Amino acid sequence: MSKIRVAIVGVGNCASSLVQGVHFYGNAQGTDFIPGLMHLDLAGYRPSDIEFSAAFDVHAKKVGRDLAEAIYEAPNNTIRFADVPKLGVPVHRGPTHDGIGAYLKDVVPLAPGKAQNVAKILKETKTDVVVSYLPVGSEKATQWYAQQVLEAGCAFVNCVPVFIASRPEWERRFAERGLPIIGDDIKSQVGATIVHRILTDLFRKRGVRLDRTYQLNFGGNTDFLNMLERERLLSKKISKTQAVTSQLGHPMRASDVHVGPSDHVPWLDDRKWCYIRMEGTTFGNVPLQCEVKLEVWDSPNSAGVVIDAVRCAKLALDRGVGGAVLAPSSYFMKSPPQQFTDDEARELVEAFIRGDAEAAAPPERKPRAHEHAPRHTKRSKLA
């Protein structure tokens, strides 16, 4: 198989975990279960087939450095589980746009000079797949980078809660260019969203009505620091909330569901603590309560999914699939163009990996009566 040339936008904790992970699993062999990987071999592509071609950031101490050095630069504070040798990949100065909010500006000194020509660099480095790790609330920056991806002729993995793959106008532009996009908003391996989704689906399947629920999240990384600026949270709250409510079997009042980040606790570093509470009605109208506490290292938890999303994006490129790639988007992302249960989405992504034609465009699942339309008309104001 050919190599997968990957460019990274935003060299933060998530990028650090992905780069470390590619090195960590580079010599993994065999076909047995490998802890941390959903797929060692994904249609012939292994983690060792991923190589980094370019990186973009605005941080003064990251721009100009080798990617292998920049991933360990503060304020990055994720766990260091691999020592990555120099990659020969410099971090380029990207545009700032709306990427740095009121809280981040105190910890992210901006590199001097003008932004470099991103589309040109992507072409010159023969990049196949661009992965976006921009901060929450980077609406303009995400759309700007999406345009550069289109101009450079790359596939796009949109890990941030800015709606690109799930918006018809953007999805159409990728389809017209014959370029795949997997998005939007990465779903961790075993994170708050997927645990909450599966429990919600379990309630429905077992005949329990979910009456009220909350999901509270605390973390110590710059993602949680950035999200203290509530004005940047609109897309994030929409994304996390609909990921859960899409699994319901009945309508739920907006006041009875609360999902979102809650606070920044610096000493947690890149760890995230999540508290989920669910109150329901079961047999005989008898109440039921469920509480879950989840503790994870946030960024490795997402990298375990991105390492598959990148390979699926390259598969789509190889197969000439353009536009939103529904199967991997539905399994890997919180806000895909079309929601399925996680069991359904897993079956679809396995079929896609095998090359089953129908997996590229799965049949429409009729939304349940309470669900929002999948094309999110309210999101047009985010353009």
Indicate residue ranges for each PLM-predicted region.
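N-terminal glycine-/serine-/threonine-rich beta1-alpha1-beta2 phosphate-ribose binding loop
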Residues: 1-145, 233-237, 274
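Active-site-lining helix/loop region of Rossmann-like oxidoreductase modules
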Residues: 9, 48-51, 62, 73-76, ...
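Gly/Ser/Thr-rich loops at beta-strand to alpha-helix junctions
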Residues: 10-16, 134-140, 160-166, 187-193, ...
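Short acidic, glycine/serine/threonine-rich loops at helix termini
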Residues: 19-21, 65-68, 168-171, 194-196, ...
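C-terminal active-site/capping subdomain that shapes the small-molecule cofactor and substrate pocket
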Residues: 39, 274-383
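Short catalytic-loop micro-motif centered on adjacent basic/acidic residues
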Residues: 130-132, 156-159, 182-185, 213
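Rossmann-fold NAD(P)-binding glycine/threonine-rich loop
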Residues: 136-151, 159-180
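Rossmann-fold dehydrogenase core element
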Residues: 173-186, 207, 211
